Amino acid sequence: MSDIAITISLLALVAVIGLWIGHWKIRGVGLGIGGVLFGGIIVAHFTNQYGLKLDAHTMHFIQEFGLILFVYTIGIQVGPGFFASLRQSGLKLNGFAALIVLLGSLAVIVIHKLADVPLDIILGIYSGAVTNTPSLGAGQQILSELGLTQTTSTMGMAYAMAYPFGICGILLSMWLIRLFFRIKIDDEAKNFLKESGQDKETLGSINVRVTNPNLDGLRLVDIPGFDEKRDVVCTRLKRDEHISVPQANTIIQKGDLLHLVGEIPLLRKIKLVLGEEVDVPLSSFTGDLRSDRIVVTNEKVLGKKIRALGIHQKYGVVISRLNRAGVELVPTANTALQFGDVLHVVGRSEVLNQAVSILGNAQQKLQQVQMLPVFIGIGLGVLLGSIPFHIPGFPVPLKLGLAGGPLVVALILARIGSIGKLYWFMPPSANLALREIGIVLFLAVVGLKSGGNFVDTLVNGSGLEWMVYGIFITFVPLMIVGIVARLYAKMNYLSLCGLLAGSMTDPPALAFANAIKEESGASALSYATVYPLVMFLRIISPQLLAILLWTLL
């Protein structure tokens, strides 16, 4: 067999062994995809003993391409929620998550200077301690830029030493915080439900009878809250036992019953303007009115504003809600449509079919992947990652690299949604498949490269010392931020657990946090809020650390 054939065969063997190891669980917690790294170390130990030669060029290409696939699909997945997570509702969570990253970076600097740990080793320990594989790839990229290519294998070995406690340390910090503050889980779950009901602007609906005489004879569009900004949507109007879909120019009369959809706080306010809330059923449809869900799949309407489509003006169809990437929104006339948007519409049966023909609603398209945008995005990401940014005082220009470039481009493209007929929506199943393939390829190569001397380093070298450093980098930032967030910010414990798991981008830790109170979504919500920003910071931080520490050598 050729060296290339042997290399690919061994990579497949590593993937099989590693994924099998990753399925092992102790009390519901396992290595997950990280098992591939240890599968590579095991295989590398024996290939080193038997003197098998692997093709270096093939290994290098597979490692880099796997990393690109992984970070690009991560960006496409989290892109729609990335910028939303930076808004006011997520500022506190993202602030604490960024503080964890900052404290971990400071711990790296302290250990590097006081213990005189080599740059490649401390970056590998850092990546393993925070259980973030793209961080490892970014670190190896910047070391190559600094001319330290020969040290990238030892970086992978250090990563493997620190990785196991990186997972266990998150779980331990959750348990200790719970013990220290004597937290009662049921009380925390009740408090979260109470707080989310008051603070989170969820969508709701109410039925209101118009009793304000000042509104009699006004057009619907002239009433505050129903203008073009449309903070609240009126989907049905009942007058004299007849239910209709109101238009913008519909004249409102005293005694009309209106079915309103919007954010709960806004519904409370507009109820005070209109009249009184009534318990009269308007949700059930009579006559030829019906409600439907339409998925936007027609490339011709992507990027267009709802006003430009004229659905409401031409057909009398009201779009009451818009679900985008799992987030429910109140659509306005200026809302631009994206591929995969789910619209809740109300109208007469015959005109709803015309709305479907305009918007698409082709369910099969949701399962198809446009490959052209995928490779456009990857190509743009690689180009962006190769652009040098010259920063005064730095000895070498800073680059986003193959880890940062595709991630940034994917975040932007996912936020844009579409350009012309090109759309960057990717079905969740396809995204997950590409992401898993990418990370398996990357970790398999890292394991093969670093596994030859792993056992010797652990038994006879500095392996145990590296583990101690990793424990410090994992544990100290989590405990400091956890205590501060609970003690001073009064953060809900379930949300705090999601924050700690998200700050390490660690799915096993999220599974553990969810299991604390399975029926509560607090942990998953805070995890999803901080995940996009943390992933970006975890990729950028090792590059900044490498350049900073390299200049201080």
Swiss-Prot record:
One Gene Ontology term, aspect cellular component: plasma membrane
Bilayer-spanning residue ranges: 4-24, 28-48, 65-85, 91-111, 157-177, 371-391, 403-425, 439-459, 464-484, 496-516, 533-553
Entries under Gene3D superfamilies matching the protein: Regulator of K+ conductance, C-terminal domain (3.30.70.1450)
Matching PROSITE patterns: RCK_C
Domain of life (superkingdom): Bacteria
Gene Ontology BP, a term: potassium ion transport
Family: Belongs to the AAE transporter (TC 2.A.81) family. YidE subfamily.
HAMAP family recorded: YidE
Name the record gives this protein: Putative transport protein PM1071
